Amino acid sequence: MTFIEEFIYKGYLNQCTDLARLSAITQEAKIAAYIGFDCTATSLHIGSLMQIMILRLLQKHGHTPIVIIGGGTSKIGDPAGKDVTRKALTQEDIKRNAEGIKKSLSKFIKFGKDQGDAIILDNAEWLDSLNYLDFLRDFGSYFSVNRMLTMDSVKLRLDRSHHLSFLELNYMLLQSYDFYYLSKNYNCILQLGGSDQWGNIVIGADLIRKISGKEVFGMTTPLLTTASGAKMGKTAAGAVWLNEDLLSPYDYYQYWRNCEDADVMRFAKLYSELDIVELNKFESLVSEDINAAKKQLAYELTKLCHGERLAKLALETAVKIFEQGDIDENLHTFILAPEILQSGISAYNLFYNANLARSKSEARKIIRGKGAKINDQLVEDENMTIDTNFLRNRKVIKLSVGKKRHILVKV
């Protein structure tokens, strides 16, 4: 399959400025294409995984992926997809977040200076030195305010009478300038992004066409939700982060292992690197044994993010817990000060402190609803005292909420 054929087959396509022309060009020559990530957190989460897989797909087909870390644009904040103004980030926040995002991306993308290697850039390199008056003089006349106000990212805020600052309105100008800069200096002809980026991408393509007459393209991916309508990347317990310092490989594995039945085949197409033959076999497995398919999906995606060794460890840990009823030391752990356990702590307090409940009242509710276990034994009394007598021979206490959330308490 060609790059565009595989892009469509995997379910990545939402809109394209000229799909037929882009398909022809990518078959005739190798191109450079870019995706940007703003520095809003210390790690990317699975909400960005489709964009990351597209970067891998570009690399697979011999094209050059360019990753833009938004060290400059993060100082403003993209209004796209937001009802309220984003909280301003400090320079220290942006720098720390940029390093974390580079770590996330390096798990999936090969960066370097060899042919086919991805390029990573920080738009602060050119935006920080941009003179405002010069920018207005040289580029201001190319932007239509009338058109900017019709873009969904702006129009939705205005229609709801929500605040939209002049600062945020400038974001699409700077993103457009990014595309222009990459087109001029890296011969980049394609910008990719989520569906909420369509307006920004089109304005950038128009800017390049007006200034240089160069043919460039924009392509967006669909907004993804789970089969039940939940937003990708978020769970009741928090975001599904790609960096292991924020989410353990075991918990990452468990997220995919516990996905809805209706999502299994779709996720395999979107997020795995199984080829067509393997996907056809996997589709048969989904029909025959959904749990076996979920285990394979979770293993494949964890291997891609965390490597084969940690993926196998996560799989083995899950088998021991769910199929053999054993305690495994590789479970996520919570360290409790020895003096607390020596003097005793109430059951609901322990579950709350171990982050198995968002509040003490929720911990009480879980126990009252018979959803909590200690060392695989149902907790009947929320106020029961947990002390050193509950430590098992490996000096741990196993806490469980429902069938799928487990943690080891160590002292």
Swiss-Prot record:
A motif ('HIGH' region) lies at residues 39-48. Residues 345-411 form the S4 RNA-binding domain. GO terms for biological process: tyrosyl-tRNA aminoacylation. Pfam families: tRNA-synt_1b. A motif ('KMSKS' region) lies at residues 231-235. SUPFAM superfamilies: Alpha-L RNA-binding motif (SSF55174), Nucleotidylyl transferase (SSF52374). Keywords: Aminoacyl-tRNA synthetase, ATP-binding, Cytoplasm, Ligase, Nucleotide-binding, Protein biosynthesis, RNA-binding. Its EC number is 6.1.1.1. Transmembrane segments: none annotated. L-tyrosine binds at Y34, Y171, Q175. One of its GO terms (cellular component) is cytosol. Coiled coil: none annotated. It comes from the Bacteria. Homodimer. Belongs to the class-I aminoacyl-tRNA synthetase family. TyrS type 1 subfamily. This is Tyrosine--tRNA ligase. The gene is tyrS.
